[in-house]
């Protein structure tokens, strides 16, 4: 009798179009793409379909600028990925899959101060409002992702700038707000949720 092992997760895959509503030229990505113009021949990206996995999209080449989480599904125009973000971007120019080794047991610890100092709080669930759950400050000085991948937002209700925080990048350690992302100018985080695969 042979034993069949369970299949692993499907590889990350997304398709990009240079026009809204999945029109125009397209390009399929299966791995990191630092510049979709050079690799895929697209001058801009106006619609996206995530077929497998979760992805982080950046408004500039080389994984720079505002981050946008793209989970499985269709994004027919810029408003679908910008949502209620405080920053609206009608262009996405670099992409990478989210590294998420252990989503089923996601854990993150928030710290009041930089370098993991001060009051701390461990989370294992989604929180649409950190202040309402007892976090006294509007800011998070540092954080450690023990497992999984998270997306933190500037404001309650999953609004404002997005920061994708993964256990498998930076060893899960973000010593100060500037390590949250290239666009991070403040440690203001007021809601956080697990990345959905």
From Swiss-Prot:
The segment annotated N-terminal arm runs over 1-11
Highest rank taxon of the organism: Eukaryota
Q: A Gene Ontology MF term for this entry?
A: identical protein binding
Keyword annotations: Eye lens protein, Repeat
Check the record and name the Pfam families matching this protein: Crystall
Quote the InterPro entries the UniProt record gives. Beta/Gamma-Crystallin, Beta/gamma_crystallin, G_crystallin-like
Family, according to the entry, reads as follows: Belongs to the beta/gamma-crystallin family.
Job description of the protein: Crystallins are the dominant structural components of the vertebrate eye lens.
* Summary of subunit composition and partner proteins: Homo/heterodimer, or complexes of higher-order. The structure of beta-crystallin oligomers seems to be stabilized through interactions between the N-terminal arms.
Q: What is this protein called?
A: Beta-crystallin A2
């Amino acid at each position: 009798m042979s034993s069949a092992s369970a299949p692993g997760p499907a590889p990350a895959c997304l398709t990009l179009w240079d026009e809204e509503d999945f029109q125009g030229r397209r390009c399929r990505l299966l791995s990191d793409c630092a510049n979709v113009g050079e690799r895929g021949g697209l001058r801009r990206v106006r619609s996206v379909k995530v077929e497998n996995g979760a992805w982080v999209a950046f408004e500039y080449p080389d994984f720079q600028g505002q981050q946008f989480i793209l989970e499985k599904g269709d994004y027919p125009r810029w408003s679908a990925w910008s949502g209620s973000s405080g920053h609206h971007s009608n262009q996405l120019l670099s992409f990478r899959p989210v590294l998420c080794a252990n989503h089923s047991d996601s854990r993150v610890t928030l710290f009041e101060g930089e370098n993991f100092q001060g009051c701390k709080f461990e989370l294992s669930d989604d929180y649409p409002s950190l202040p309402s759950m007892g976090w006294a400050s509007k800011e998070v000085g540092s954080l450690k992702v023990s497992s999984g991948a998270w997306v933190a937002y500037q404001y309650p209700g999953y609004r404002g700038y997005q920061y994708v925080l993964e256990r498998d990048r930076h060893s899960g350690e973000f010593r100060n707000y500037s390590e949250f992302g290239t666009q991070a100018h403040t440690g203001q985080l007021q809601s956080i949720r697990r990345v959905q695969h």
